[in-house]
């Protein structure tokens, strides 16, 4: 993306590109994932990537659900942006409080911790969100960190993360102007995916 944080640029394990495939998981439980890739010479290679788990009863708010109304910290709430953002440089998505804008305008709510991410894609997806924010400035864009005091401890999840019952990171919620979740994505996403999600959320506003 056009916006690449130092976290992403300096992390050799960070995702440098996102490839999208829509797959239907027709029963709950763990699934193994194998990626088959054809290179520019027409040659194929395969690699096993991180598995996924499908839930019979998913606790995370989904498409069509009302988004939980929680306060998200803004620049006005802290003396230093580093308290609410581990990205270098900090993201520009700390101007609006979800509790104030929910149901009034579309919202792009991104839970991610660029410096502390276990999946190595938090930094890249924040970069993607920054690019879409520049190109589509209408919605409220909110970046929410995962851990209290930015200490990577599963016992110190921020209240907002607990309210959304998130088991992993990153998570993206694109919410329409009625406060209803229109798109939910766990993990990595592309500029085109987020752009399409914002376009859908803006319809009818």
Task: Please provide the spans of the model-predicted regions.
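Contiguous segments within soluble domain cores/interaction surfaces
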Residues: 1-26, 30-81
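Typically the conserved alpha-helix immediately C-terminal to a functionally engaged Cys/Sec
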Residues: 119-135
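Thiol-/selenol-based redox modules, centered on thioredoxin-like
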Residues: 59-63, 73-78, 182-205
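A Trp-anchored, charged/polar loop motif used as the substrate-binding/catalytic surface
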Residues: 81-98
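Short active-site neighborhood of thiol/selenol oxidoreductases, capturing the structured segment around
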Residues: 98-118
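Thioredoxin-like thiol-disulfide oxidoreductase module
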Residues: 143-169, 173-181, 191, 199-202
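Loop/turn elements at helix/coil->beta-strand transitions in domains of secreted/extracellular proteins
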Residues: 104-108, 136-141, 169-170, 177
